[in-house]
Amino acid sequence: MKSVSVIGGGLAGCEAAYVIAESGIHVNLFEMKPGKHSPAHKTDDLCELVCSNSLRSDKLDNAVGLLKEELRRMNSLVMRIADETRVPAGGALAVDRTDFSKRITEELKKHPNIELISREITEIPTEPAVIATGPLTDGALMGNIENLLEDSLHFFDAAAPIVTLESLDMNRISRASRYGRGSDYLNCPMTMREYYDFVRALVSAETAPLHEFETVNVFEGCMPVEVMAKRGDLTLAYGPLKPVGLAECTASDGKKPFAVVQLRQDNSEGTLFNIVGFQTNLRFGEQKRVFGMIPGLANAEYVRYGVMHRNSFLQSPKHLTPFYSLREREDLFFAGQLTGVEGYVESASSGLAAGINLARLVNNRPQIDFTRRTAIGALAHYVSEYNGSSFQPMNANFGIMETLPNAPRDKRRRFEALSQRALQTVDSIAAKLKQQEK
């Protein structure tokens, strides 16, 4: 049996390993845990979600919702397990992060074509491989990648705290989703005075040191709440704390809230909640003090404080093809946030595309280009063909997809039309792959 290596047991690596194994090729899946953990990882399981438990929108008029549906139609392992471990989150797909990781780990361990090897890899493999070691790649392996490619980039990422439901004062909190879409979120309404007092405390709170890193380059999609607050007194009120779509929510003065902090369910039992949009680099003691000013959180018990860590990514447009293979070496693929895709689902998407194409290369079949008509392909073409002045990580969005001729002027209808075309393209690719397997 033919054999390849996949380095890294995150979303991209696990998706790549699964799709390669499903094609009948033996996979050595290398993961450094449990022997070694990165600064952001806490468990020994694969596919650990370190930032949020939300995979974001599940609607087809949203690009990440489209990306999820494309992955489902490509028999994605990550999406199947995400759907099976989902927790209430309104129009979004959120998962029980513990169950999600455990289920992925179990699926891969029992696959007859996958051997899970707990070992840190420091050298670039000489055999066909996917490197999906994630944005925290460092040490000897990162040094060898930089030597091979002669460059890399980095930015900083942050995670939000998680609190226990039983420690919250539910007399100050209401359950509802925005615009009447269920009761999945906990809402902490603030008066104007409470909001401004909170912002003043937040911007003056002490942050944790970043040690050797002097210049902080923060990714907009995971901006620390204290950095947002320093952009202006009303930035949070018009951002993650916007008080819209919550008609039944009232502040302590009996009036419409000036701002609302939302908490999202983090496990299937509904005993843990994360503070939405509150990625942070505050010292742990400062988090307890400042976030304790949020109505209902005065005595909150934190099972995980927010953390901030360095993320690395490659100058992918110089080095990668739209198949995620290295221009300089066709049997070496990269996947995940290391390539410049940003987000859980986006990482899984790159792993799926890289895995499909490595398997096809090993089996002497032509590569599959998902094209910019699909969200999967648009991300692949973005990281491999970006020609602007400053390459930065990118989430799924309709702006990087191929435009639609005679598109509807209404934005929602236009996005839905783009999604329908994308799904037709993905269905055609899936059918072609299935036919070739026979």
Would you name each region that the model predicts?
Residues 18-80, 372-383:
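N-terminal FAD cofactor-binding segment of flavoenzymes
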Residues 1-12:
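Beta1/beta-strand and adjacent pyrophosphate-binding region of the FAD-binding site
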Residues 110-269, 273-284, 288-289:
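Predominantly flavin-linked oxidoreductase catalytic cores and closely associated redox partners
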